[in-house]
Amino acid sequence: MENQDYFCSVIRDVKFGENVKIYGFVNLYGCEIGDCTRIGAFVEIQKGANIGANCKISSHSFICEGVTLEDGVFVGHQVAFINDRYPRATNATGQLQSEQDWFMERTLVKRGASIGSGSVILSNITIGENAIVGAGSVVTKDVPANAIVAGNPARLIRYVTTEEPVAAVYERRKTGAHRAPLQ
């Protein structure tokens, strides 16, 4: 594991793969991080979360217990995963909730998916392989493989196509040809 700065970071009981890179001011505990994953500053990853290999988790993101990111997942800045759809401070008797009162739901983000900055991913969701969640989206239900979803709530926009080789997409990005002219 390589780090830029451990100052004011809490890293406890974490299983790290090879060549993991962590930037400062993180809170990681009881989770697993796969090989060659990059974790930005001000990220929290809770116990029981599993992060695959070659993932990128951008700054200020929150990954809670019960979340699994498969290999090659991108998480933009300020993404929040939720593992309880009906959170309450107190139980039915008015006492502060304990672990026994809490019902955690799991979330799975499959290989190669990308989640745009500022998105919120509710619990009990599966985001399919190579799916793209647009920035600022609120994902309330499963996202199919290769789907592009956006909005609040997130809705299907279209599907990613495999007709264009990846190299051609990167070439268009370098030249700026992917941008529409301003009207």
Listing of model-derived features with the role each one plays in the protein:
Residues 1-15, 22-125, 153, 160-161, ...:
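Flexible, glycine/small-residue-enriched loop-and-beta-strand segment within the central core
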Residues 149, 157:
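Hydrophobic residues at beta-strand termini and immediately following loops
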